[in-house]
Amino acid sequence: MVFKLAHALLKARPVEGFDLKDFLDLVALATVADIVPLVKENRLLVRHGLKRMEQTQHNGLRALMEVAQVKGPLTSADVGFRIGPRINAAGRMDRPEDALEALMCNANVDPLPLAERLDSHNRDRQAEEQRIHKDALKCYEEEHHPDDPVIVLGSRDWHPGVVGIVASRMMRRFHKPTFIIAIDEKGIGKGSGRSIGGVSLMDAINANREHLEAGGGHAMAAGISVHEDKIADFRNGFADFVTENVSAEDRLQRLHLDALTAGLLNHLDSEPANLALDEPA
């Protein structure tokens, strides 16, 4: 959005010597890291941005690539799984200004310590994620029946910055729509949800507004605010919604198989790819 706005302004009032293409590496970084659908113009911008990122002139990004041990030719997976998480970890661990400082540092600042700080945040995030995931698995075994159509878990010992990642892992492991909720000292839970095909989290949220303080997102990923005392009511309402609106057959996990051909091998090299334009497999 910012890139398109800048493009429109420069068309109206050109600035001599200013080339917006110099920022395509940051456009690619932001687009992939934020899981923006890689379709139409987004795909084109990311494709050219990845090429420019290999010779980036942005000191902070270059240092971050060094710390992440990312080398060309770059793919969307390099950004999505190695560079992006280190930037996002700063916000997840309550230090978003560190990511901004690293990306905006000029030639007079040594960017390596800033990049290493982001790498440290990412290691902290990974440790916290592992701890919460292990705890969530234990809670699931204690609180849920295997036939339950949904997973809704909450704790005062969980960090709100990583509940979305844990929700994704739980959803993939059990193939059930999942909300993981971090509860603060006032008893207000901030939850992150991830869903399976056929189950819209927004429809489920709208059907259970009476149990929630707030909720928003889209069909496959959403966030909620819920009082600790209402989590059980929300879990029951969420389960009822899924049972009543989505058949058990539609909730089955499906494996799509295809033939391996020369054309498919060429297709496997297609870049970039992400959630909206799946990586060929």
Each model region followed by its residue ranges:
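Hydrophobic helix-and-loop "lid/oligomerization" segment in the mid-to-C-terminal part
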Residues: 11-231, 240-244, 256, 260-263
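Accessory interdomain/linker segments of ATP-dependent helicases and helicase-like nucleic-acid enzymes
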Residues: 252-254, 259-281
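Short, glycine-/small-residue-rich phosphate/pyrophosphate-handling segment
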Residues: 1-4
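Secreted, periplasmic, or luminal enzymes acting at the cell surface/secretory milieu
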Residues: 239-245, 249, 275, 279
